[in-house]
Regions:
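Short connector loops at helix/strand junctions that flank enzyme active sites
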Residues: 16, 24, 37, 42, ...
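Local beta-strand/beta-hairpin segments that build beta-sheet-rich folds
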Residues: 1, 75-77
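A residue-level structural signature of the nucleotidyltransferase/glycosyltransferase Rossmann-like core
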Residues: 13-14, 21, 39, 126
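Active-site beta-strand termini and strand-to-loop segments that position acidic
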Residues: 23-26, 100-102
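Unchanged
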Residues: 47-72, 81-138
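Acidic, metal-coordinating catalytic segment for phosphate/diphosphate chemistry
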Residues: 1-20
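Charged phosphate-binding loop/patch that engages nucleotide di/tri-phosphates or the phosphate backbone
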Residues: 137-162
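Conserved Nudix-box catalytic region and its N-terminal flanking loop in Nudix hydrolases
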Residues: 24-64
Length: 162
């Protein structure tokens, strides 16, 4: 079977199913900047056909952050539906956010690497930020940023935005 991400794009709409990891170390959060854009995101990526969200998270964290995590290292804390219009197209994103305990696996404060995937070549820049620093940057989506700042991780939140 071909490796196929759970996403499709048409002229009038697109759909994406992703997993995202909120990696916490020493009360700081790992954020990602893609190709020098003016905003930040959390590391993650698309789930593949036939892959569970947990398998996808383990794979994506390995690919993007270069650490091995196991099921006991993470737990679901938010289910996010993000529906909005961009360039005359309806964008529909389903994202599952996991709180990831990286332990001592990540020793670096910041780093970059070049990723070459089906969407092209891009530089991914990573850094750990405190909650106070997080308040000052543009982390997308905004509702997730607000959830992180509030530190509401005890249950599973369901957020619909757009």
């Amino acid at each position: 079977m071909d490796i196929v991400d759970v996403k499709f794009k048409e002229k009038e709409y697109s759909f994406h199913y992703r997993v995202v990891g909120l990696i916490v170390r020493d009360n700081k959060y790992l954020i990602q900047n893609i190709g020098g854009k003016d905003y930040y995101v959390l590391p993650g990526g698309h789930v593949r056909i036939g892959e569970s969200s947990e398998e996808a998270l383990i794979r994506e964290i390995k690919e993007e952050v270069e650490i091995d995590i196991v099921r006991e290292d993470f737990r679901l804390f938010c289910y996010h539906e993000n529906i909005y219009e961009k360039d005359n197209r309806v964008e529909h994103w389903i994202e599952q956010y996991y709180l990831v305990d990286s332990g001592e696996k990540l020793g670096k404060e910041s780093w970059s690497f070049v990723e070459n995937d089906v969407d092209g070549v891009k530089t991914l820049n990573y850094s750990f930020v405190s909650k106070e620093e997080l308040k000052e940057i543009d982390l997308k989506p905004l509702k997730i940023k607000e959830l992180i700042i509030s530190e509401e991780f005890s249950g599973i939140s369901h957020i619909i935005s757009g």
